[in-house]
């Protein structure tokens, strides 16, 4: 990909982004490397911005592939050296990205794998005019979670709604 300007990579413990960032920066240092974590499990994002290795009290996200409380020590050093920025995305943004990938690309991605697309779709990074790669790292999503994610994405996009009407429990109310 000689004309790529930016690469967005999901982050859990940091192994994938460390390898990707090192390889790309070794060949083309001008390419921007961006990492993405779920807002409910931002261990590397906190460490990156605080410039120190740290552990979270909890990591809560349906993107279980990146639900990591403590980033790797070695990977933290690599990320600090080779990654340009790390952002977080919400559960709703991840759900919308999964739905967009299904509808537009016919691709089933797990929550962790969809975080780069979520960051791009929701303007979390300065990507205007850049040729960007979103690394979609996995499709291992439970069908029950997928069903809830689809519903959530449809509600977010205004294509599905719930209507509840309170009725008295007596004949003739319907």
What role is predicted for each listed range?
Residues 1-81, 122-168:
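Glycine-rich phosphate/pyrophosphate-binding loop at beta-loop-alpha junctions
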Residues 5, 72-130:
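Active-site-adjacent helical/loop segments in soluble small-molecule enzymes
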Residues 170-174:
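Short amphipathic alpha-helix segments
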